[in-house]
């Protein structure tokens, strides 16, 4: 499982 969170 892969989780990616991007905050810009």
UniProtKB/Swiss-Prot annotation:
GO terms for biological process: neuropeptide signaling pathway; regulation of muscle contraction; sexual reproduction. GO terms for cellular component: extracellular region. Keywords: Neuropeptide, Secreted. The keyword Secreted applies. Vitellogenic follicle, fully grown oocyte, egg and internal egg-capsule (at protein level). Not detected in previtellogenic follicles, external egg-capsule, central nervous system and hemolymph. It is found in: Secreted. The keyword Transcription regulation does not apply. Has myotropic activity targeting the genital tract. This is Ovarian jelly-peptide 3.
């Amino acid at each position: 499982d892969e989780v990616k969170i991007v905050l810009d």
